[in-house]
């Protein structure tokens, strides 16, 4: 996966449509090619549907209009992820410990990240005591990406094997 994280995939797809339009490619074909690249990614289909609706509404193709829509999709993701983080931090008790699975950080979105963004913000606001990060097999997104992002932000964290999460929860850690 070159681009991973549902929000980032949607944003990349929107800009992919813009690049196809600039190149003079058949947009329906380009959109279907992008859609087939990761058919289970909800944001991919959502962004491509928005871009396709814009394309269908204008003839001839207005690249500027497509660029504005792609920029709006990217901007919306920034705003929505920040709102999610702001709300999520308010739900966490002081000195909490959290268990994070997979990767939901800033490099998976156009903004600050989703669940991992909440963890980083909780650390910055003095709410978080520790983050446990599942390795997330088979691609190891937790060990490779989440742990890296948390380390870059100075968040105290420990990578654990996926099977250890049940033990941590049983112990109340």
Predicted regions and their residues:
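C-terminal binding/interaction regions
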Residues: 35-97, 101
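Glycine-rich phosphate/diphosphate-binding loop of Rossmann-like nucleotide-binding domains
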Residues: 110-159
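Acidic, glycine-rich active-site loops and adjacent beta-strand->loop/helix elements
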Residues: 15, 34, 104-106, 135-140, ...
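Long amphipathic alpha-helical segments
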Residues: 1-59
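Glycine/serine-rich anion-binding loops at beta->alpha junctions
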Residues: 1-9, 40, 98-112
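General beta-strand structural signal in soluble alpha/beta enzymes
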Residues: 46, 98-101, 108, 133-134, ...
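Buried hydrophobic packing segments
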Residues: 13-21, 48-51, 88, 115-122, ...
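Glycine-rich phosphate-binding loop
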Residues: 155-173
């Amino acid at each position: 996966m070159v681009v991973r994280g549902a929000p980032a995939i949607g944003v990349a797809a929107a800009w992919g449509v813009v690049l196809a339009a600039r190149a003079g490619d058949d947009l329906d074909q380009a959109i279907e090619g992008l859609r087939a690249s990761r058919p289970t990614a909800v944001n991919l289909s959502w962004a491509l549907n928005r871009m396709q609706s814009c394309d269908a509404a204008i003839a001839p193709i207005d690249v500027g209009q497509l660029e504005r829509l792609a920029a709006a999709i990217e901007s919306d993701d920034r705003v929505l992820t920040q709102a999610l983080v702001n709300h999520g931090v308010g739900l966490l008790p002081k000195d909490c410990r959290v268990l994070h699975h997979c990767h939901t950080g800033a490099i998976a979105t156009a903004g600050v990240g989703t669940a991992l963004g909440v963890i980083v913000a909780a650390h910055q606001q003095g709410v978080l005591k520790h983050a446990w990060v599942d390795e997330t097999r088979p691609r190891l997104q937790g060990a490779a990406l989440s742990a890296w992002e948390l380390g870059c932000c100075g968040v105290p964290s420990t990578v654990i094997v996926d099977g250890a999460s049940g033990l941590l929860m049983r112990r109340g850690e």
